[in-house]
Swiss-Prot record:
Subcellular location: Preautophagosomal structure membrane; Vacuole membrane; Endosome membrane
Gene name of this polypeptide: ATG18
Compositionally biased intervals (Polar residues): 270-284
Function: The PI(3,5)P2 regulatory complex regulates both the synthesis and turnover of phosphatidylinositol 3,5-bisphosphate (PtdIns(3,5)P2). Necessary for proper vacuole morphology. Plays an important role in osmotically-induced vacuole fragmentation. Required for cytoplasm to vacuole transport (Cvt) vesicle formation, pexophagy and starvation-induced autophagy. Involved in correct ATG9 trafficking to the pre-autophagosomal structure. Might also be involved in premeiotic DNA replication.
Name the record gives this protein: Autophagy-related protein 18
Ranges where the record places region Disordered: 241-296
Protein family per UniProt: Belongs to the WD repeat PROPPIN family.
One GO-annotated biological process of the protein: protein transport
Lineage per the UniProt record: Eukaryota, Fungi, Dikarya, Ascomycota, Pezizomycotina
Motif L/FRRG motif, residue range(s) on this chain: 204-208
Main localisation: membrane
Origin species: Ajellomyces capsulatus (strain NAm1 / WU24) (Darling's disease fungus)
Record's keyword terms, sorted: Autophagy, Endosome, Membrane, Protein transport, Repeat, Transport, Vacuole, WD repeat
Coiled-coil zones: none
The WD repeat ranges on this chain: 163-203, 208-247, 295-341, 353-393
Length: 400
């Protein structure tokens, strides 16, 4: 059987695999949403082996999200919201072109938020299309990584998160609906914001080289964030205060790596010249005082940018202690707490690697310190992770 779609349910207790376009479960219930043909949705009761309802949409269904209150259907330029109890259409959202169906629905029934790329209005045009031409879209593809947070219970947009300077590639919301993780199409920086007030809480560095982010997942207690990408390394970031004096293991040197014998402050300055160049590494939001500090310290930033590669780590650490928070956070995102190295496969450097990277979906077990990884080449891996020391996870189970 060809594997066309794979996903975990909302609490990561079940894994759904199918040879159809889309398959989504509602927690551990018998309710399953199926996309059997591009525009047709079927809601099925697997216990009774009966079809509850079928819906047809004007264009291809790209994603389905559901919790105990809402069913969300994502098309390329529209999002449909349904009451999952009655299957009544509640609201239709017009979006910018979203061919990758980037969106996240909170599993929570109370904090029932939907996150998706902020629609970007098309600029006015003086060109008048002929009468027989189809109507032009009111939105264009996003050029930045802003996220709109929509309350699916009140049916209203409640906030905008200025997450990244480049377009988004992945979004994830935690179990309680209080945290939002974001990644841009560069994939070097992962950010975590509070929901619904959109305050930036954490900023992590996945690696120094751009890479497509395939999957992000919070653990059930929202203390860890797991991220998979087009590289063979799965990164696990710790949410919460980390003591800079802690001597944690570090992931191997490479595109997803860092220096292994330096302090967090020294590591920050070792990459200062590259991160100060802007792009996805620069924060796009912050307190007004932080922004003001950056403006008034522009000369100092320029000096450090030119000389950071030539100064010693001890001097860099001393200077770094005097920099305002708004400046230091530009090049000081936290590194991974733990990591996993997937086995070499056809998509990760093995024979036939020209086929392209293997896509992966990650989740963390709700009752054991384990990370579950499913890859598009049909492998299911389970890794143990040391929650006290971090470091590299160990492979304990493998299925194919």
């Amino acid at each position: 059987m060809a594997m066309n779609f794979v996903t975990f349910n909302q609490d990561y207790s079940y894994l759904a695999v199918g040879n159809i376009a889309i398959l989504e479960m509602l927690f551990s219930t018998s309710l399953v949403a199926l996309i059997l043909s591009p525009r047709r949705l079927q809601i099925t009761n697997t216990k009774r082996q009966s079809t509850i309802c079928e819906l047809t949409f004007p264009t291809t269904v790209l994603a389905v999200r559901l919790n105990r209150k809402r069913l969300v259907i994502v098309l390329e330029d529209q999002i449909y919201l349904y009451d999952i109890q009655t299957m009544k259409l509640l609201y239709t959202i017009e979006t910018s072109p979203n061919p990758n169906a980037i969106c996240a629905l909170s599993p929570s029934s109370e904090n029932c938020y939907l996150a998706y790329p902020l629609p970007q209005k098309a600029p006015p045009s003086s060109f008048t299309p002929p009468s027989h031409a189809p109507p032009s879209s009111a939105h264009i593809s996003p050029t930045s990584g802003e996220v709109l947070i929509f309350d699916t219970l009140k049916l209203e947009a409640i906030n905008v998160v200025e997450a990244h300077k480049s377009p988004l590639s992945c979004l994830a919301i935690n179990t309680e609906g209080t945290l939002l993780a974001t990644a841009s199409d560069k994939g070097t920086i992962i950010r975590v914001f509070s929901v619904p007030d959109a305050q930036k809480l954490y900023q992590f560095r996945r690696g120094s080289m751009p890479s497509r982010i395939f999957s992000m997942s919070f653990n059930i207690t929202s203390t860890l964030l797991c991220v998979s990408s087009a590289t063979e390394t799965i990164h696990i970031f710790k949410l919460g205060h980390q003591d800079p004096s802690e001597d944690l293991p570090t992931s191997p040197i490479g595109t997803d790596s860092r220096k292994t014998n330096s302090t967090p402050r020294e590591r920050a300055f070792s990459q200062g010249s590259s991160t100060l160049s802007g792009g996805d590494n620069s924060p796009t939001d912050g307190d007004p005082s932080d922004i003001s500090s950056r403006k008034h310290n522009g000369t100092l930033m320029g000096m450090i940018r030119r000389t950071s590669q030539n100064v010693g780590n001890s001097f860099a650490a001393t200077v770094g202690g005097y920099l305002p928070k708004g400046v230091t956070e530009i090049w000081e995102p936290a590194r991974d707490f733990a990591w996993i190295r997937l086995p070499k496969t056809a998509g990760y450097g093995g024979p036939g690697s020209n086929a392209g990277p293997v896509r992966s979906v990650v989740a963390m077990s709700s009752n054991t310190p384990q990370v579950m990884v499913v890859t598009s080449d049909g492998n299911f891996y389970v890794y143990n992770v040391d929650l006290s020391k971090g470091g590299e996870g160990t492979l304990t189970k493998q299925y194919s």
